[in-house]
Amino acid sequence: MLVEARKKLIFALDVESGASAEEWVRRLRGKVGVFKVGKQLFTRCGPDVVRMIRDHGGEVFLDLKFHDIPNTVAKAAIEACRLGVRMFNVHALGGRAMMAGAAEAVREYFAAGEDVPPLLLGVTILTSSSEETLREVGVDRPVEEMVPRLACLAKGAGLDGVVASPREVGLIRRACGRDFAIVTPGVRPSFAETNDQQRIMTPGEAIAAGSDFLVVGRPIAASEDPVGAAQRIVEEMAAALEEG
């Protein structure tokens, strides 16, 4: 189960330079399954950071949360495919047409080839968002209603899964079924601080709830022993998988 659990652990490369990113990739390759590249690192380094990770044999989650007019997002989706990422995401709040356009672009790009397409994920509600945050932007529905609603919208648009807090995993499973990937940030092992995440669980709890992939950054990066921290998280995930 350790190998399977390791494939499900995504390390967030929330760093300020390509050199720092490469240092982490060298340190953690083989210890985690996927490396997440977000807006800060991608804006600083561009596509080269994705190529660097792949050159080291790593998989990439391109976490840019595309949200624009459908044509623009569809073209961005094609560029993500060209980079060879393992998964990337769009904002579910962008609507059905935007998500469906991205899904169709991915299908068409891989239609004639033998390569495996990336997982296309919809971002539901950010784990840093509370109901007060939603009310500030005019959304009066509770988080536990909005998340499965957006997940169903994403599935109907042809996406492969969603990004959501582990607290809503059960709601998504009931609404969308088992054959729908759920990637969960907001995961904090017992030995780590919660930081700015609001709706969190431990790695074991998240896996037990039905998460397919866990995104972890600071609990590993801020540890005195990052490799050991990653291993402890993988072991907790593996134990939950065995119990499940």
From Swiss-Prot:
Q: Which domain of life is it from?
A: Bacteria
Sites binding substrate sit at 14, 36, 63-72, 127, 188, 197, 217-218
Read off the CDD domains from this record.
Answer: OMP_decarboxylase_like (cd04725)
**Spans through the membrane:** none
Task: Give me the reactions it catalyses.
Answer: orotidine 5'-phosphate + H(+) = UMP + CO2
Concerning SUPFAM superfamilies, the annotation shows:
Ribulose-phoshate binding barrel
Which PROSITE patterns does the UniProt entry name for this protein?
Answer: OMPDECASE (PS00156)
**An example of a Gene Ontology BP annotation on this entry?**
'de novo' UMP biosynthetic process
Its Gene Ontology cellular component terms are: cytosol
Question: In the UniProt entry, which residues are flagged as the active site?
Answer: K65 (proton donor)
Q: What does the UniProt function comment say about this protein?
A: Catalyzes the decarboxylation of orotidine 5'-monophosphate (OMP) to uridine 5'-monophosphate (UMP).
Similarity comment? Belongs to the OMP decarboxylase family. Type 1 subfamily.
Q: Which NCBIfam families match?
A: PRK00230.1 (NF001273), pyrF (TIGR01740)
Question: What quaternary structure, including any partners, is listed in this protein's UniProt entry?
Answer: Homodimer.
Q: What is this protein called?
A: Orotidine 5'-phosphate decarboxylase
- What taxonomic classification does the UniProt entry list for its organism? Bacteria, Pseudomonadati, Thermodesulfobacteriota, Desulfuromonadia, Desulfuromonadales
